[in-house]
Amino acid sequence: MAVLDIVTYPNKVLKQISKPVERFDKDLHKLLDDMYETMIKNNGVGLAAIQVAVPIRALLIDIGDEEGKQSKDTLIEVINPEFLTWDGTQKDTEGCLSVPDYFDEVERYKNVKVKFFDRFGKEHVMEAEGLLSVAFQHETDHLDGHLFVERLDYIKRKKFEKEWKKLLKQKRKK
């Protein structure tokens, strides 16, 4: 396994719409394994393939167990996700490995039902609420070329852009 480079905002790669996975083979398995190592190394709870510059509809979610401990047992590998139902709303603070060091409150559906495939091509249907629901929506947004900051209202979005420019200037000085 290898730790992959994470593509960060404002890289245009993140705006690409990811293509459906057609082959459930060893190359996909290696990518998923590398993505998991990358996500864990970077303290993430989710990672979409496009975030490592691979434009396919594959993502990982690991919100951990009841104590927040992440492991392969709590990992959900999601290929070609499709939302079947959604309802309710919730606001939660989100962050993103592609937008490092920025967090803000985003409104999402509270409950979702998602159909997807695992690494072997087996179909699954899962109902999710709370953080898991947020993670499914956040990571699937990546597959559609969107970042969580696009869901911010106008004032918060302008604040983000200003803070992000300042952060980039600070990083360049180092």
UniProtKB/Swiss-Prot annotation:
Its cofactor is Fe(2+). Binds 1 Fe(2+) ion. SUPFAM superfamilies: Peptide deformylase. It is an enzyme of class 3 (hydrolase). It comes from the Bacteria. InterPro entries: Peptide_deformylase, Peptide_deformylase_sf. Fe cation binds at C96, H138, H142. Pfam families: Pep_deformylase (PF01327). Keywords: Hydrolase, Iron, Metal-binding, Protein biosynthesis. Removes the formyl group from the N-terminal Met of newly synthesized proteins. Requires at least a dipeptide for an efficient rate of reaction. N-terminal L-methionine is a prerequisite for activity but the enzyme has broad specificity at other positions. Belongs to the polypeptide deformylase family. This is Peptide deformylase. It comes from Nautilia profundicola (strain ATCC BAA-1463 / DSM 18972 / AmH). The gene is def.
